[in-house]
C-alpha cells in the first residue's frame, strides 16, 4: 500500500536510506541499554525520517544528494559503534533477515500497523496525490501539506524498521518498491495501481516463501 505512494512521489531512495540507517538505531539502542532492537530502530527511524523531511524542505541541495549523505553517514556511524563494542556479529543476520524468528507479539504489532495504514490511506491518499502533483495547489485547497508529509514519512519509517528483522536491510527497499513499480507499468488508473501492487506483493511473498521452503 505504502509502496505505491513511495514510487509515485519518487521516494525510493528515501526508503532505502531508512533501511540502511537501521544499523545506527541498533547501535544506539545497544549503547543505551535498550534490550529490544526493534524499539531503538523505530525511534531512530522516526527521528531520521523527520530530519530528512525537514532538510528537504529547506532546499539546501538536491534530494538525492541529501539522502545519500545522511544514509552513508548513518550507516558508517552504526557500523563503527557496533564494531567497537564487538557486537556486530550478533546483528549481522539483520542484513538478510529471518522470517522464522518472528514472534506472536510482533505479528500483533504488524497487524496494528496494517490497520493504521489502511485507515490513514483511506483518509490521506487523495491528499497525498494532490501534494505529489502540485504542493502549492494542494495548499490552496486547504490541504495541510507539511502534516501529511510528516505523517507519511513517520509511517514509512515505522513499517521499514519493524520489517527489517524478517525482510533484511538489503531487501527492505525491494519490499516497497518492486511491487509498486511493476504495478505502475500495467495500471491505467490509481485504483488499479494500488490493487495490482497489493497483488504483486502478496504473490511475490508467498512465492518466495514456497521456493525457500521446498529448496532448503
What are these regions (language model features)?
Residues 4-87, 183-196, 211-216:
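Short loop segments and helix-boundary regions at transmembrane helix junctions
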Residues 7, 22, 93-95, 132-136, ...:
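Re-entrant/interfacial helical elements at transmembrane boundaries that shape
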Residues 63, 67-126:
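Transmembrane helix-bundle core of multi-pass membrane transporters
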Residues 92, 96-101, 200-216:
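C-terminal binding/interaction regions
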Amino acid at each position: 500500500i505504502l509502496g505505491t505512494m513511495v514510487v509515485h512521489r519518487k521516494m525510493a531512495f528515501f526508503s532505502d536510506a531508512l533501511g540502511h540507517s537501521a544499523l545506527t538505531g541498533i547501535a544506539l539502542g545497544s549503547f543505551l541499554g535498550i534490550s529490544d532492537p526493534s524499539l531503538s530502530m523505530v525511534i531512530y527511524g522516526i527521528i531520521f525520517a523527520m530530519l530528512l523531511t525537514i532538510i528537504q524542505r529547506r532546499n539546501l541541495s538536491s534530494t538525492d544528494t541529501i539522502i545519500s549523505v545522511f544514509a552513508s553517514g548513518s550507516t558508517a556511524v552504526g557500523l563503527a559503534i557496533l564494531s567497537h563494542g564487538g557486537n556486530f556479529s550478533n546483528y549481522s543476520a539483520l542484513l538478510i533477515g529471518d522470517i522464522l524468528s518472528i514472534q506472536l507479539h510482533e505479528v500483533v504489532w504488524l497487524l496494528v500497523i496494517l490497520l493504521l495504514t489502511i485507515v490513514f490511506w483511506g483518509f490521506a491518499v487523495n491528499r497525498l496525490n494532490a501534494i505529489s502533483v502540485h504542493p502549492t495547489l494542494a495548499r490552496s485547497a486547504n490541504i495541510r501539506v507539511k502534516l501529511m508529509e510528516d505523517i507519511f514519512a513517520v509511517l514509512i519509517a515505522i513499517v521499514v524498521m519493524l520489517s527489517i528483522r524478517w525482510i533484511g536491510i538489503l531487501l527492505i527497499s525491494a519490499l516497497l518498491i518492486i511491487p509498486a513499480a511493476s504495478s505502475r507499468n500495467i495500471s491505467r488508473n490509481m485504483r488499479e495501481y494500488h490493487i495490482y501492487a497489493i497483488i504483486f506483493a502478496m504473490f511475490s511473498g508467498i512465492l518466495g516463501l514456497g521456493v525457500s521452503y521446498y529448496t532448503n
